[in-house]
Design a protein with these regions (language model features):
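Conserved short histidine dyad/triad with adjacent acidic residue
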Residues: 66-67, 78-96, 137
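Short histidine-centered beta-strand/loop micro-motifs
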Residues: 89-96, 113, 122, 141-143
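A hydrophobic/aromatic-rich effector-binding and dimerization subdomain
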Residues: 2-6, 57-72, 76-78, 143-182
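N-terminal low-complexity or simple alpha-helical regulatory segments
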Residues: 1-75
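Short, conserved beta-strand element in jelly-roll/cupin
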Residues: 94-115, 153-154
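Extracellular structured ligand-interaction cores
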Residues: 96-99, 137, 146-149
């Protein structure tokens, strides 16, 4: 399978993405701010809604606050997992117990990080990526139908082994990775 064939398989919306798109199109304003869970999103949606759209009791996608290695690695021998980010899913903060690389494979997405004093937001254009350390509250929002945002999930131990020589350097990049791992 070549690159174009792979991309073509990733573009069609999955059923739950279609549900999220319907909600987004009813009230895009509700997606402008990051929430913590479905209840927070429903409240935000109600405050900004002019469409009369009625949200369901349950979220159409997973909106848990903590993701562990066990959640993303069904086989404990796996070192890396690649997960396509759900398009149109409400941006919600969640904490990771592993390292994640958010990669804008096609189109754009927004990345949010919760800081100690101020939240940060950045636009990732096609080809951009961000490395997310463990224990960081973060969120991603992909709102373009033909966009593909990829989450590359790495175990802490795998990252340390793969970048061992970089960790031995004495510079700001190695300091960042040391802090991320330990």
């Amino acid at each position: 399978m070549n690159y174009q064939e792979i991309e073509n398989k990733l573009i069609p919306l999955r059923d739950y993405e279609k549900s999220c798109r319907e909600i987004y199109l009813a009230n895009p304003e509700a997606f402008r701010h990051v929430v913590w869970n479905w209840e927070d999103f429903k409240e935000q949606f109600r405050r900004t809604d002019t469409s009369g759209y009625v949200l369901g009791e349950k979220a159409p996608v997973f909106m848990g606050n903590v993701l562990t290695e066990q959640d993303c690695f069904p086989d404990e021998n796996m070192e890396c997992s690649i997960i396509i980010h759900d398009r149109y899913a409400p941006p919600f903060y969640h904490n990771l117990k592993f390292i994640k690389v958010v990669y804008a494979l096609k189109g754009r997405c927004r990345f949010f990080a919760q800081g100690k004093t101020q939240d940060r937001e950045c636009l990732l254009e096609e080809g951009d990526f961000v490395i997310v350390p463990p224990e960081m509250n973060q969120a991603v929002f992909t709102w373009e139908e033909d966009a593909v945002t990829v989450n590359i999930i790495l175990k802490r131990s795998t990252f340390g082994e793969a970048f061992y020589s970089l960790l031995l350097e004495n510079d700001s990049i190695s300091d960042f990775f040391w802090q991320m791992l330990y």
